[in-house]
Amino acid sequence: MGRVIRDFFTQPTLVVAESLLGKILVHKPRKGFCYKGMIVETEAYLGNGDDACHASRKMTPRNSVMFRNPGTIYVYFTYGAHNLLNIVTEPEGTAGAVLIRAMEPVEGIELMKKNRKTDKVINLMNGPGKLTQAMEISLQQNGSSLHDTTLYLEEGTTIAGSCIETTPRVGISKSTDLLWRKYISDNPYVSKASPLPPTKKKRIVLES
């Protein structure tokens, strides 16, 4: 399975957010360890016109990575407990990123169980803080490139547009009208139920 090319991340942020669904995130933190998960849920964030974005006001030391080249890894620590994984998507100097909200475990599941301290596979990666814990993703990856590290993306399965739901983002209090959350219909690993009725509800059909 080939890696996702650099130009993929230069597409508009909302396009990347949807196109990431079905892609395989791979992390090889050290020899003999390999984690893989299929992305099933994302959220887009933009510095311009999006008050829920960390960079909506100005660049700060914390959010400066969001202004780097597309394909840069942006990891931030939140709620005093969780590392959240984002991928930078806008041209250098313009803030924008896609949050990886949930994934379906593919490889390294037994190791993920140990990292998450649970035997329930359904709970391994069904949330942005859970998936980073499961895959040993931390602030050490912040600012790295998906093309030059042990954390990278592989081409996975193309998800038909009719099988993708679009809703408001979860857990925010600003810019709640923006329908910038994308997830695969009926996938059990999605982080939580939609905050509003989904735009469409159809049986999943995967395109090869």
From Swiss-Prot:
Give the first-level EC class, as a single word: hydrolase
Say which domain of life the source belongs to: Bacteria
Leader sequence residues: none
Q: Note the NCBIfam families from the entry.
A: 3mg (TIGR00567), PRK00802.1-3 (NF002003)
Query: What EC number(s) does this enzyme carry?
Result: 3.2.2.-
Name a single GO biological process: base-excision repair
Pfam families in alphabetical order:
Pur_DNA_glyco
* Keyword field: DNA damage, DNA repair, Hydrolase
Classification via InterPro entries:
Formyl_transferase-like_C_sf, MPG, MPG_sf
| An annotated Gene Ontology molecular function | DNA binding
Q: What's the protein called, per UniProt?
A: Putative 3-methyladenine DNA glycosylase
What does the sequence similarity comment in the record state about its family?
Answer: Belongs to the DNA glycosylase MPG family.
